[in-house]
Amino acid sequence: MTEITNKIYYVGVNDRNKHRFEGLWPLPNGVSYNSYIIDDEKVALVDTVEVDFFTQFLENIHEVIGDREIDYLIINHMEPDHSGSIALIKKYYPNIKIVGNKKTLGMLEGFYGVTDDVVEVKNGGTLSLGNHELSFVLIPMVHWPETMVTLDAKNKVLFSGDAFGCFGALNGGIIDAEINCETFWLEMVRYYSNIVGKYGIPVQNALKKLAGVELDYICSTHGPVWHEHIEKVIGMYDKMSKYETEPGLVICYGTMYGNTERMAEIIARAASKAGVKNIVMYNISKTHHSYILRDIFRYKGLIVGAPTYNAGLYHEMEVLLSELANKDIKNHLLGWYGSHCWASKAVAKIQEWNDTKLHYEPVGEPVDMKQAITPEVKAQCEALGKAMAEKLLAE
């Protein structure tokens, strides 16, 4: 068993089998579903795990409390990867009381048909377990409407739900002090940008509610328990939720036969020669868009390019632009280019996306290539890369 601090234990599980989180986001390094036991005069379980892992979950609980009853199940977040074991927990602990806010209890009935033995809490409400006095802070839309966090102020522990989480299974170590966290930082950005990224304002509201709270541990539902890196983790969330970026450039291209890829290489070389050091390039047909969105969240500059396809825009570029619009990612500079064989549509379609959905600041002149690179097209691509570099370096 892993004791985090003063009778607070980790009882979560790892999932190294699932290919995609929520059926969408690749999990090359797996994911953890974190749950916690507070072993006091009254025993509280904070969140559960995905139902497929209930057997291991129950073993973890028994290792901590043996045959004792669980008095309370605190639900910070109702998404099924955290609430999926509720029905089974009730079966094994029939006297358990489920603690949640009004919206939690509505979802509890909707998902699992549970209406009895529930305790509704409001923002600022408290629950005493004996030596542990818990309080509840509602943080709606981080990233579901019922989301709340649970604070043990005496022990300086925050049970944060999905907030401050990241992708990646826990390979032995549970607390960040036991782990080489370098493997988790980019996965935290990918997790935030794809799962929480749409909700920057609610995240800012949550951070303001928690401002001034002294913390020694942040116990999220995914990824490490944060102890040594609390300031960094909160700072990352603050920066990302403000849509603050670094002076770098993401170049995304779709290509069928290499021509738009060659344009991307020319643009990248020009931006580099003009002084931009942080440049990442993606073939959007090869790299899953969750990784691309991660880097778009990090860097201010974005240049996209794709061929015309079936009198429209190359499909994978449509998908990427749709994701950008859906996530409402703000505060970017945008350049674009395209190619066609006989009828130009791609460049106009990208501009339409920006005019109607993205609303990024345009940079440089769009480049529209017919069929293949010419000296004129090469010069236009170089001009686009240079214009973006000058804008980024002037910020």
Regions found by a protein language model. Give the residues of each.
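Terminal amphipathic helices with adjacent charged low-complexity linkers/tails
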Residues: 222-246
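Conserved beta-strand hairpin/beta-sheet module of binuclear metal-dependent hydrolase folds
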Residues: 2-65, 149-152, 156-160, 249, ...
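Active-site metal-binding motif and surrounding structural segment of the metallo-beta-lactamase
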Residues: 41, 52-99
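FMN-binding flavodoxin-like domain, especially the glycine-rich phosphate-binding loop
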Residues: 170, 174, 180-218, 222-225, ...
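Metallo-beta-lactamase
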Residues: 3-6, 99-147, 199-205
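Structural motif
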Residues: 42-44, 72, 156-159, 217, ...
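Active-site neighborhood of phospho(di)ester-bond hydrolases with catalytic His/Asp-centered motifs
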Residues: 46-48, 71-78, 98-102, 158-161, ...
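Short acidic active-site motifs
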Residues: 85, 288-292
